[in-house]
């Protein structure tokens, strides 16, 4: 995906950034949020808390990446789909109001193409993770996730 275009676009629009330290949370599952976040620098972990209180890691994301784009494009507020915690020493995020972000997307063909590719990639990764979880034991799942992380680092 053309991450450069997204980052350049946000820079040109002078979108403010948010800095977070290691292990700080950007969002919590279920909390209302008004902004879309784009990870500019760093690594974050997305997770949810299971009913029994254990944390279930969904994925690790490295910059650049869109963090909170899931859900609809017209609501000013939406609930966070997962927890987002900084795993690197620090992380920098662009913070843009959701409605404003979608207005930009709807007016810019190149940005629309980027978002479409983003959704396709996210869907593909979600299906892959689901396959791993349903077909393998927990130990094998962890090994597969580790291999996937190594693959992502090489990209």
Where do the PLM segments sit?
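Cyclic-nucleotide recognition modules
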Residues: 59-116
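Short phosphate-coordinating micro-motif centered on Lys-Gly-acidic
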Residues: 24-32
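Local beta-strand/beta-hairpin segments that build beta-sheet-rich folds
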Residues: 26, 58-59
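A cytosolic small-molecule/anion-sensing beta-strand core signal
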Residues: 21, 40-41, 62, 88
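Polybasic "coupling" helices that flank or enter modular domains
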Residues: 109-155
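Short, small/polar residue-rich loop motifs at catalytic or cofactor-binding pockets
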Residues: 12-13, 31-33
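Glycine- and acidic-residue-biased ligand/ion/polar-headgroup-sensing regions
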Residues: 34-47, 52, 63-64
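Cyclic nucleotide-binding regulatory module and flanking cytosolic helices
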Residues: 1-25, 66, 71-75
